[in-house]
Amino acid sequence: MAETQADYTSLLEVLRDGAARAGMLERDARSALYADKDTGRHRALMEQRAQTLIDLESRTADLLNALPEAERRQTRSALRAFADGARTALDLGSVFYMSALLYRDNHKAGEPDKLQALVEDLETRLR
């Protein structure tokens, strides 16, 4: 049980780190665009954010094995969807698509994005 709890902790740390990095890159990109009027830096930061989502899928691959089957499938599916969307956004070169990767259509300011919600849900279920 202690080993499983340590695995959960490791997984949650990687997910929290990825969510924090994605959020930081998004805030920095927004600042580059609106405060600095630097569209090149904005694009570069959004590309880094997309790459962060792609990397998160591979960084968690082995750690997901510690989860019970239902949580493992659900989490793997969500991370794959984030990564696939990020790959598509990068392939298209669409900054708009990159900016929308983690948000529901009806997202409201101040609400957690889909990655943050996934982390919060896992934290609750793994207690």
Kindly label every feature range from the protein language model.
Residues 5, 38, 65-76, 105-112:
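Short, structured coil/loop segments at alpha-helix boundaries
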Residues 1-48:
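Short terminal alpha-helical segments
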Residues 53-81:
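Short, solvent-exposed, charged loop/turn and helix-capping segments
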Residues 9, 39-51, 73-81, 113-116:
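Short, charged, amphipathic alpha-helical segments
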Residues 80-127:
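Amphipathic alpha-helical binding modules
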Residues 18, 22, 49-53, 57, ...:
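Alpha-helical transition-metal enzyme core signature, strongest for iron centers
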Residues 25-41, 60-70, 93-100, 126:
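Secondary-structure edge/capping motif, primarily at the C-terminal ends of alpha-helices
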